Amino acid sequence: KQKDLISYWAMDHYAGLLLQTGANGEGNYHFLKVFEQAPSRRHSAYYSFNISTEEDWAATYKQCQTPKEKALMHFIRGTRQEVLGLEDMRSIFGLMGNHEWLRIVMAREINKLESNNLSYYGQLPIAQLMQRVDKGQSLLKNEEYEDYAGQLLRFATTAYYNNRDDSFWALAKGYLE
């Protein structure tokens, strides 16, 4: 255990050095491995895994040797606050099926959608909200997210019908409806 801890600590630092030298694909791949295999270093690896260009994404993705590693890349990107994670969820689903990472990204997307776009009941009188519902208007602050919310609902519905024994998808589908 102690040897593993030290080796992942060293790999975490080595990955940072690779990024500093411009070997972004290799550096991010090492952060990915640390995230996957070393729970005590996961926080550091998550925030150090920083892909800002398509070129870096492709270079890192090329390093991945298994579908699980590729899905983990999509998981990390999909959980970022500044990213709409639906495409990453589709990739995770294609690579791993109904994996726990898929459910986590969906939960984060629902949370992001809610915190960034919904008018809270305490801020608007319930009568105003009900008038918007009666008129068929969106409850979202940013109506551009209306289509995205619909896409999330379609994804949750598909996942629900393909995984009826997983109550998470019934809950996600119901919440998004």
Q: What residue spans do the PLM features occupy?
A:
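Alpha-helical solenoid repeat scaffolds
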Residues: 1-177
